[in-house]
Each structure stands twice: as C-alpha cells, then as structure tokens.
Amino acid sequence: MATAGGILDQLNKASSAEDFFALLEVDYDPQVVNVVRLHILRRMGQYLVSENFEGQADDAIRARCKEVLEQAYADFLASSPLQERVFKVLKEAAQPPKPKPMVSLTVLK
C-alpha cells in the first residue's frame, strides 16, 4: 500500500529530471536528458495519468513508475521532440494554417 514518504511522495518532491532517474534507478545519457528533460517528464505524466495506484504496494508503484520513465525516455531516444509533440506549441506547429475567410466580390454588390 502506498505510504507517506513512498515513491510517489518522493517523486512529487523531486526537483529535476535527474532526481526522477535516480529515484527510479533508470540509467540515462546526461546529454540526452539535458536536451529533452521536460519532454520526458511530460510524456511520463501522460503515461501515468491513466494509472490507478490506490491500494498498491510501494514496490509495485515504484516498478510501474520505473517502466513508464524508461518508456518515456526511450520515446525520445528513438525520435525528436518535434516528432513526439508533447507540448501544445509543438502540436499546433504541426497543424496547417487555417485559411482566411474569403468574401466573394459579387456578394458585395
């Protein structure tokens, strides 16, 4: 069962991506994390949002969080932030510009 001071509390108090990797004992390349740290943590959050940890043992929660962080990290080893588009600004950059409304000149007569 999750307890105060458990892994979720520790992750909530973590102040850097490196803290997440250390707490969950996930190996990483510092050069990769320096470039895409926010993207990795955002993706991890996207994966975890559908998880329900209520009533689970802290070891099980830690193992699942580790799997999710490893997957989020792997996502950005295999592709770029522009391809993954985890942030709104990058999602919107992929959309073509909306056409400007046109008024027919014959309507103006």
From Swiss-Prot:
GO terms for biological process: nitrogen fixation. InterPro entries: NifW (IPR004893). Keywords: Nitrogen fixation. It comes from the Bacteria. The keyword Flavoprotein does not apply. Belongs to the NifW family. HAMAP family: NifW. Homotrimer; associates with NifD. May protect the nitrogenase Fe-Mo protein from oxidative damage. This is Nitrogenase-stabilizing/protective protein NifW. It comes from Azorhizobium caulinodans (strain ATCC 43989 / DSM 5975 / JCM 20966 / LMG 6465 / NBRC 14845 / NCIMB 13405 / ORS 571). The lineage of its organism: Bacteria, Pseudomonadati, Pseudomonadota, Alphaproteobacteria, Hyphomicrobiales. The gene is nifW.
